[in-house]
Amino acid sequence: LAEVVKRSAGFSRRSLVDKLGIKPGSRISFSNAPRYYSSLLGLPPGELEIVGDRSRDLDFLHLFVRNRKRLVEAFPKAKRRIKSNGTLWVSWPTLTSTLAGDLSENVVREIGLANGLVDVKVAAVDEDWSGLKFVYRLKDRS
């Protein structure tokens, strides 16, 4: 029972698909996601096109990183994979997670801004991962 309380404490009852803004018919991909990510999302079968790690023209990409060095390397590549009206979520381990490294919300935001995207939302993915939603600025969308 204590484990159940720990996992649900402080987390929204909304589904992760809703929190992340994944829409039916979207072309989506995940990079370095935890093994349990698909079950955490609770994706409705057949409503999304889930594509591989190198696909482009994505409506939604969720990048999981554990340290600053990896994020600095991965962010520009991830940005190129999304459509100009697409969404890039970047997740990093929470400070209380056993996975925690040298990332924080401010560091992730700083790297995103330096790469020309803006953050528009923050969300708890689960007890181990936080996330920031990045999009292209309105003037940069086609």
Predicted regions and their residues:
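N-terminal, charge-rich interaction modules
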Residues: 1-43
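Short acidic low-complexity segments
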Residues: 47-58
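N-terminal and secondary-structure boundary signal
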Residues: 48, 78, 139-142
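Short, glycine-rich nucleotide/cofactor-binding loops
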Residues: 61-71
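A short glycine-rich, Lys/Arg-flanked "PGG" loop and its adjoining helix->strand segment in the class I
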Residues: 72-84
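Conserved beta-strand signature within the Rossmann-like core of class I S-adenosyl-L-methionine
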Residues: 84-94
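Conserved class I S-adenosyl-L-methionine
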Residues: 96-109
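Class I S-adenosyl-L-methionine
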Residues: 115-142
